[in-house]
Amino acid sequence: MNSYWLNIYKPRGISSAKLVSMVKKILGKEVKVGHAGTLDVEAEGILPLAVGEATKLIQLLIDAKKTYIFTVKFGTKTDSGDYAGTVIATKDYIPSQEEAYNVCSKFIGNVTQIPPAFSALKVNGVRAYKLAREGKEVELKPRNITIYNLKCLNFDEKNATASYYTECSKGTYIRTLAEDLALSLQSLGFVIELRRTQVGIFKEENAIRIKSPDEITKNFLEEKSIKIEAILDDILVLDATDSQAQQIKYGQKCLFNYEEDFRRLSKFAYREEFEENTERSTAAYTLVREDANTGLTYKLPLEVELSVSLLWVRYKGNLLAIGSLNKSCFNSLRVFNLL
């Protein structure tokens, strides 16, 4: 079975699950397909799909940063937080253009959000949106998110709307962000347009747009496929020997030779991820290495007990496993059947 990613652009009016079903119909019901983060039915934009063994990497994409462009209608609140909901409150005050632009700085950084009642989160095993549609009260716990960037792109005084761009962490609800923005401006608001423009490495410029499954063939999707390792480009990689690969395949812990393998790891030593996730012991001997990008020289312990929270192992050019390196030992998190 082929394993790869598809960069799909979800149109408005279709659920993420329905889109997965459409692709499965094209590829074959026996093919495993999953999506990396639900998009609301009323939203459009990037919905990465994992095919085959790529489904084992979905969590990495769910954890990735995402970018959105959304438009807020001021002066009105709906029960769902978007245009598909029922109006439940109105307010005469509409913020000015200056206020709509200046409010952004208040939301950049670590933020606490209460997810909307109309969401796919579960309450006692039941989807919150199902309870909300039945008129039942839904209480969801606040969650911590991060807004890396937020800026106003356009303000329309006549229509009382403002469009925003945001880069945010996983778990961010744009409908809640829009409502919180409006409240901060002493008004009310709901989302009238929502577009996800990027998820990790997947961008809208080269996305596949599916209108009908009859228009797209399996060969077309496979031609547009993205290699499974593409989302691992910024993560450390080790090449396994035959014996190491055998151990990993059988779920055994695998030892790596540090004098040899650390030299290979050192190619990536100056990436930010490596610096953050590495613990170094004191050693009498050091490996002196110059970073080609900065020209700076680093002295690193050669006999090092290295710990990396996430890396992947490659065998004969193919993805074998992802996992962690704890001192001298590789512990697999996922093993892939790609050989």
Curated annotation (Swiss-Prot):
Residue ranges of every copy of the RPE1 insert domain listed in the record: 262-307
Keyword line: Isomerase, tRNA processing
Catalytic reaction(s) noted: uridine(55) in tRNA = pseudouridine(55) in tRNA
Keyword check for tRNA processing: yes
Example GO biological process: tRNA pseudouridine synthesis
EC category: isomerase
Active-site residues, record numbering mapped to chain: D40 (nucleophile)
An annotated Gene Ontology molecular function: tRNA pseudouridine(55) synthase activity
Signal sequence region: none
Isomerase keyword on record: yes
Pfam family, one: TruB_N
EC number: 5.4.99.25
Family: Belongs to the pseudouridine synthase TruB family. Type 1 subfamily.
PANTHER family (alphabetical): PSEUDOURIDYLATE SYNTHASE TRUB1, TRNA-PSEUDOURIDINE SYNTHASE
Primary role: Responsible for synthesis of pseudouridine from uracil-55 in the psi GC loop of transfer RNAs.
Entries under HAMAP family matching the protein: TruB_bact
Protein name (database record): tRNA pseudouridine synthase B
Organism expressing this protein natively: Rickettsia felis (strain ATCC VR-1525 / URRWXCal2) (Rickettsia azadi)
Gene field: truB
